[in-house]
């Protein structure tokens, strides 16, 4: 029986989606998973190929992958992605698009298997070192990682590229060669083509030693997670915001570790030391009457009520009006704010036949809301209800004609209150 080189202890799941580029590494991975399936007939195996459109050979690569999967009786999903310039660089953007496609393709109960190996681990470590990363970044890749509500497995992570080549030759496998892999303008290619061969010539076991260092860094991070668990419980609210008061008495090092872990929990990119310092100085310690904001790509960190918030950047909609001619059907909101709909059963009256329905994001004058005596301006209501400033001109306001009826999830006006049991509710799916 052929001895598999992949780490079969990872393969407890019986439903596997294999990332399959058609290159050497993923071909060996898929071949070994096919052999694994032969030994375990209850295993369901699929493959996914990402068509980036970056190479003139991309279509022929799809045909190659289809041929291989047909021969091995593996259902293949081909996903075409479009790469736009978002400032990340082509490598990072291609990876982001690739993993987004993986997440969208995974079925319930399915795990993702990718073909990274020991040499890839070494490259990842050195790239993190070049960026000045700490232990978290230097932990590189784990054999098992959370991903899209399931797991990402790297069963070949302990094997060298040479081992995979030997397997492929011994079993007569065919694979494609991506011409971009020979372009040392890319950092990872530079390491693989130029730097690592020199290092391995001097120290043959260099990749294995680097992998051990990555493992030690990962262990240190897990230890820190354990030691800081009670701090995180004290600092993080049920809404996922970060309380500032417990951080004030912490050492700089401890506070930075808490900030990093909070951002990781919000799926934010790992911040540099300079970024952490800016978060603390420019946002956390800003004047009490300020509304500080620090942008990170398409997200931002803000302070409100002595808490830090990690939020998606959304342009204010202060001047926007969205007509809702058929209020019985859901309405799409601008700027990625989601949808609203009026559903039967609730405390809002239905619109009268002569009343037009619209969604707006500002309301002038003095307002009277249900459950409160006296009138207030909208700004005062937002403050009383604890609505953060950045949500005040992105929260949908329901109007019948020129009359404000309700703010989604916040309040109902007296003019909008239902007088019978035929009321409706304004539901906002953000």
From Swiss-Prot:
Question: Can the keyword Ligase be found in this entry's annotation?
Answer: yes
Q: What is its EC number?
A: 6.3.4.19
GO molecular function, a single term: ATP binding
- What's the superkingdom here? Bacteria
**Do you know which Gene3D superfamilies this protein is assigned to?**
1.20.59.20, HUPs (3.40.50.620)
Stored SUPFAM superfamilies: Adenine nucleotide alpha hydrolases-like, MesJ substrate recognition domain-like, PheT/TilS domain
Q: What is its main location?
A: cytoplasm
The answer to keyword S-adenosyl-L-methionine applying to this record is no
Q: Where does ATP bind?
A: 21-26
Where in or outside the cell it occurs: the entry states: Cytoplasm
Task: Name the reaction it catalyses.
Answer: cytidine(34) in tRNA(Ile2) + L-lysine + ATP = lysidine(34) in tRNA(Ile2) + AMP + diphosphate + H(+)
Q: Which UniProt keywords apply?
A: ATP-binding, Cytoplasm, Ligase, Nucleotide-binding, tRNA processing
Q: Where is the signal peptide?
A: none
Offer one example of a GO biological process linked to this entry: tRNA modification
The cellular component terms of Gene Ontology attached to this UniProt record, alphabetical and capped at eight, are: cytoplasm
Protein role: Ligates lysine onto the cytidine present at position 34 of the AUA codon-specific tRNA(Ile) that contains the anticodon CAU, in an ATP-dependent manner. Cytidine is converted to lysidine, thus changing the amino acid specificity of the tRNA from methionine to isoleucine.
HAMAP family, per the entry: tRNA_Ile_lys_synt
Q: Which NCBIfam families match?
A: lysidine_TilS_C, lysidine_TilS_N, PRK10660.1
PANTHER family this protein is in? TRNA(ILE)-LYSIDINE SYNTHASE-RELATED
What is written about domains in the entry's comments?
The N-terminal region contains the highly conserved SGGXDS motif, predicted to be a P-loop motif involved in ATP binding.
The record's comment on protein family reads: Belongs to the tRNA(Ile)-lysidine synthase family.
Name of this protein: tRNA(Ile)-lysidine synthase
Q: Which gene encodes it?
A: tilS
